[in-house]
Amino acid sequence: MYGHTREQFEEHLFSAGELTFALYYGTFGELAGFAFNGVQCVTHGKSRMAAFSGGGFFRPGYNGCGVVAMFFGLRQALRFKFRQPGTALGYLARTSSPVAYCLFTRTMPRVYPCRTCATPAEVDNLVRSIGEGRHYVRTNADSWVVRSDAIPRDASRMSKHDDHPDVRFYSRINPRFCEGDALLVWIPLNAANIFGGLYRQVRLRVFRWSQ
C-alpha cells in the first residue's frame, strides 16, 4: 500500500467488513505489523458457505512475516470449523506478486489456480461469484485477474525468483502485476488442507529457527 494516504489504506482494509486482528512486535517492543482476517457468508447454488479474507502488513526489515500471517489465518479457520463444522469454508485472496502466490503454494497442499492441475468448473464459478460480491474489478477476459491497490514497491527485488515454476506460472497469467493487476487465489479450507497447511507452517518455522 505504498503511496496511499491513511484514509485510502483504511478504506482498502475495512472494505472486507468486520475483522479480527493479531498484532506482532519486534525484539525491543516496537510494533512490527499486523495480520487480519474476516469472513463472508455466501450462498452458492443450494449450498451456504463461508469465504475467508485476510492478509498482513509489516514494516520492512522483518523476515518471515508472510508465514506468520498465514499461521494466524489457519488458526482462525480452524476455530471457525470447530464452531460451525457443517459449513464449507474457503479462502479467497488477491495476490499482487508472484512471491505472494508462491507463499500460498509453498505452505498449502491445495491452491487454485495451480500449474499442475486444472481448476474445476465449480471452483471457477464459486470464485467468480464471491469476487463479484466483493466488487472486485476484472482487468481482462480472465475472471481470476482483478484490480488491486497493493502494488509491489520494487519488483526488481523479486527477479531472483524468476526461474521458479510457480513464478513463471503466475507471470504468464498475470503479467501486469507491477501495474496493479492481482491474481485471485482460492484455497479450500477443509480439514485435510487446514491440517496440511499447519504442518507445513510449523516445518517452515522450525527451519527458520534452526538457521
Regions found by a protein language model. Give the residues of each.
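Conserved acetyl-CoA binding element of GNAT-fold acetyltransferases
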Residues: 48-60, 73, 93-94
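Conserved acetyl-CoA-binding loop-helix of GNAT-fold acetyltransferases
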Residues: 58, 63-79
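A short, polar/charged loop-to-alpha-helix boundary motif
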Residues: 41-49
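Feature marks short, surface-exposed loop/turn motifs that line or immediately flank catalytic pockets
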Residues: 41, 59-60, 99
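Hydrophobic, proline/glycine-rich low-complexity stretches
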Residues: 1-7
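Terminal substrate-recognition subdomain of acyl/acetyltransferases
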Residues: 8-26, 31-32, 81-211
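Conserved beta-strand in the GNAT
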Residues: 23, 29-40, 52, 57
